Amino acid sequence: MAALPQNNLQKQLELFPAKGTSNKLSLQKTKSSVFTFKKKCSPNVSASTGFIPFQQHVLKDKNVNVKQDGTHTALPKATERNKINCFFTPVYTKSGQPPQVVALKDHVHGNDSANKPPSTEDAASKKTGINTSFGSVTSLEEWDDLDDFDTSVSPPKSHAGKGGKTPQKCKNTSPVASFKIQSISPEGPTTEKHDCAKLLYDNNEVASEPRKNLHAKTAESPDQSLVCLASVEPTNLERDMCRNTDYLGTDDLEHDQETLSQVLIEEEDDCEPDFIPPSPSDESLSSPPVLKVISAQRKHKVSSLTDVNDCENTTDHLQGQSVSTSLDSKVPSQLLTLMLEICDLVDKIPISELHVLSCGLDLKKKRDMRKRLLSNDSVFRSSPADSSTVSLTSCTSSTQNRDFNVNAPKGAESLSGSSVSKVFKFNKLAVHDIGTKESENSANSAPNFMEKIGNKTSFSFRAGGDSIMENSFNFHSSVLSNSRFNTPQNEKPISSSTCTRPYSQPIDDMDNPDLDFDIDNFDIEDLDDIHCLDSPAAPSVSSKNVPQYPTIREAQLDSRNKEKNTRNNTGDTTNPSLLSDSLLKPQIENPAHERFRGFNFPHSKEMMKIFHKKFGLHRFRTNQLEAINACLCGEDCFILMPTGGGKSLCYQLPGCISPGVTIVISPLRSLIVDQVQKLTSLDIPATYLTGDKTDAEAASIYLQLSKKDPIIKLLYVTPEKVCASTRLISTMENLYERQLLARFVIDEAHCVSQWGHDFRPDYKRLNVLRQKFQSVPMMALTATANPRVKKDILNQLKMTKPQIFTMSFNRDNLKYEVLPKKPKRVALDCVEWIKKHHPNDSGIIYCLSRHECDTMADTLQKEGLAALAYHAGLADSNRDYVQHKWINQDDCQVICATIAFGMGIDKPDVRYVIHASLPKSVEGYYQESGRAGRDGETSHCLLFYSYHDVTRIRRLIQMEKDGNSHTKQTHFNNLYSMVHYCENVVECRRMQLLSYFGENNFNPNFCKEHTQVACDNCLGKKNYKSRDVTDDVGNIVRFVQDNCSLVQGRGKGRSNNTRLTLNMMVDIFLGSKSAKIQTGLFGKGAAYSRHNAERLFRKLVLDRIIDEELYITFNDQAVAYVKMGERAQAVLNGFLKVDFQDTESASSIRKQKASVVTNTSQREEMVKKCQAELTELCKRLGKIFGVHYFNIFNTATIRRIAESLSPEPEVLLQIDGVTEDKLDKYGAELIDVLQKYSEWTLPVEDICQKSGGPANVSARRSNSDHDDESCDKSSYFSSNNKKGPKRKNSSYFGKSKKRKTGGDGQQSRSKNGNSSYARKNSTAKTSSSYISGSKTGADKRPGFMAPPMPQPNRRFLKPSYSMF
């Protein structure tokens, strides 16, 4: 291995310590020493053109160039450069020849002496692979920062390029630097020549023709590289370069060369441009200084000697090279075009529609993967017409040739090289010679794109400008014509757009050891949500137009796409509002959760198996997969999801996978029982420890937990049990010591916070779990927590670094409505509303007290509605009985309950939730109302509001013994937030709820766009006028100050009659005859209606202009008297203006929107009838098998089955939620019902469309936590079709459904068993017999016989384990 030469690197590191830590992709400041071009022409020696610095460098006396054999040579002999970090490649020159250093003056005045052309043997380039100098590569640990190399030293017999942020030496010389053929060393048969440099374009022939204005005709990009050829003739180019200086002048040329030297690029002939260019600074968005030179030179327009024929010849050469080389190139194969069109169509599919497809998840993953691959595939990520950046990437193979073309419109020159003529030819490319109008839109365009064909890589460059090229290098136009200054390779394009994307290493360059890319500087927070545009179309950008959205650039585009893109890019900029959602990158709510996405974890395989087999689900909801992966990775998690969002699965699925026991802490026994029943029905070992467990049952559970490998996976406990039971704590300590304590799950975590609506002291003491079990992960879940509550939960539970998963609080299928409450008629109003809107549906009525629950239930029963009361005053057995009857709709349609009911109850078909009294907080109302419509169907949330309830609730808060005054004030604030929600008759109800929880970016036109679920405020007529009522409010405040301030001595000895309630104030303000006081304020509000007057005084209370003080009378009644508020003085001083939304009349509030009567077709009536019959069937089967009827088929699945009206099993299996196992269990009865409606059967296509259509809201939400089943097509149904034609009158389910097993406790059936599984003339067959294609005939058409009787050994009725 070649040894690294000694140098003063350490000294440079000390001089420049900050470079290594800075961003390597930032633009380095211009150094004082720049390179210039000098030439010395000698009749005997080949001219050597190199980069000569103005001053000497500290590394001048050090030689970092070694030969490949590792030996050192002394200066000034030519040396071989060792490759450091793969940024330098070996140069083979013959030693003994001194470097040709010449003065700039000779170069400027243009010596016309000819050079001796090198021989073919000496000029032959030695091809080297990527790993040619691998042995001389120094590891990154030793050379981690090349920024400290300042190689502005005179390079001996070689040319300086740029490597990293410093110039790099390379074999090839850009024609920008010199268009001569240079010979550095004498002829030698064994040396690789570094002196023959010229442009190539796939071996295009270039004619030798004298040029008068080379400065105006060399449209060479700084990104282009040179390839050494054999036997080249330099004489014409030499004379052209010398002749060109007469037009420009010495000063201009020197200025140009000084500026251009900062962006020159050189590449070696092995197609491995090992260099790292400087990146543009973020703040350097202005035009570079060279543009000023170009602008000055535009005044000197020199006519070109190039004719149209030259342009045509060049165009012909371009057509034969590659698709990306010319605009007139042949259209690629139809297959490639078709594939690109398919990709474009897939990209245009909206995400909402993509999720509905059966393969939508996989297709979305592939589409995202394709976008990422395209974004990283090449630096040429823009569309062909996108000329906003200039960047270049290296080849992946050393055998690839670099071919360049500069197509300059209207005065620009086409520069190409040929291996045949060995000379350069400059052809003028006319605009009309181009097949498309692309050049007309590329006045300031940059390189278009790159396309790989075979083993070659073609670069197509387009220089812009009509007249800008005529007196300046075409290099100026192609690189610096736009407003940004870019350098190739690893450059980060600069854009004024707010949606810029950090540059990523191209995948094509992974084989190239370009190791200067600093991945540590990558910050995922820099990524925007809408920066990934996968459209090939992009606008043509000039120096005055910067694209709003950078595009992903596809590496392979045909000319058809180029022309299409050019035609579409006539606009200045891309309008973000016109971007399709399919082109936008899917929004990531939290980019930090990106590492938890996907299925590449060790637990993923087992997780998906349990997910499908145990829970019967096939698709995760939002944030579920990320939360589950984070939980299984041992992270603390805080999950904030709305009701019905699938919180339970986030800990139940990890609990089944993780070794050990998951402790779930839940506040209510009803919630615990419901969850455990559901898990055991899924054959998941779960149990609970509550106060109603007997000692024997508790001892059995503790015994199971003490075993070496406990069967129990999830243990549900109450917070009171955790805080009070020392036996439970010791059991958890034992599990912890044996590393069998998987995690703690705190459900309904809002109970932890004192700022929440349902604070419980025992929840707050759960922080002892973190103290005792520090290494055990913790998960907190809630559906209602504003930012303050969320922060308090994390603080109380000592979750320092949790993964926070949140979702939108919007429930798009709920309809919110507030009605005025008449206290004595509220029960009758509820009956009237239920009979009108949901006469046969399940619902909940929340009441404030136990007495109201009983009264409401009695009233409903008298009016003919099946209603039962549920509150804490009932015994546990009675509560369980009421809950079970209501869940299964067993003679209980409506349940009248306090707020303690329903938390976590998973009944999907609750069609309405009525609040007969005002809730205590917005959080409580959101949670309680969210128990409606969990199946995605439209449901109602009705609230009867009366301000009288405020006083009652205030008294309840005041009488609470727990908490201090600060806590009580928090509850008062929560209460008045709820009052504000009810009093606000202008703003959308949905918007108010979401704003309370901090979700302020919700669509304000949601209700207008979805009138079916629009709230009452959005549906009502906007007959509101904003009035300035500051004067009236001032009169009210002064009246209160004079009459109701006894404490301040202003009562003037008046009696208790000065204690005025809010209703008394309204009477006085309106001038009512029943007013207590008929002076002062009396009658000043006569212009107000009573409704508006009441609203005005409530507004003053909410705005704290006046306040209410609570008193308890001798009769133990709460009365609120008016007093001055904290903002009253501001009104009196004129510092506060009060606006009031005045309504025309109170009747507009009380009017209900009449239900729209639609003409239903006969088939729709049959669908409703069938749905009702199927629901009754599920209820009967649920009673028999001891499960909830919606666990047989959920309500959404029943609705889709009813819509199909098809008895065919093949059709039913295509419906979401219908599986083979369920058809085996319940198919016979289901088919019997559907056969009654077979004449109304829809085609299969319509059924599939209805069951999975994107427009159906319920279809998107129907996959509840444990109710969805995968709907893959059954194999045995398809095999049955091969056995022959199917009988018309005989159902598939006429044959036996028995499971024949031995005495192993599995399912079994005899011939005389249940009619659901045995028919009269059928024989016993196992399920496997159907899969194999066997079919048993039936002599008679099956009918609905006696309901099946459960057997004790059926596995879906009894878990496989037994612990009691």
Curated annotation (Swiss-Prot):
Gene: blm
Compositionally biased spans, kind Basic residues: 1283-1300
Enzymatic class: isomerase
Keyword presence, Metal-binding: yes
Domain notes: The N-terminal region mediates dimerization and homooligomerization. Both the helicase ATP-binding domain and the helicase C-terminal domain form intramolecular interactions with the HRDC domain in a ATP-dependent manner. The HRDC domain is required for single-stranded DNA (ssDNA) and DNA Holliday junction binding.
UniProt region (3' overhang DNA-binding), positions on chain: 822-825, 849-851, 952-955, 1061-1063, 1072-1076, 1111-1117
Source organism, top-level taxon: Eukaryota
Occurrences of domain Helicase C-terminal (ranges): 829-976
UniProt-annotated stretches for the region DNA Holliday junction binding: 1046-1090
Compositional bias (Polar residues): 484-503, 567-580, 1273-1282, 1306-1335
Origin species: Xenopus laevis
SUPFAM superfamilies documented for this protein: HRDC-like, P-loop containing nucleoside triphosphate hydrolases, Winged helix' DNA-binding domain
GO cellular component: chromosome; cytoplasm; nucleus
Protein name as catalogued: RecQ-like DNA helicase BLM
Principal location listed in the UniProt entry: nucleus
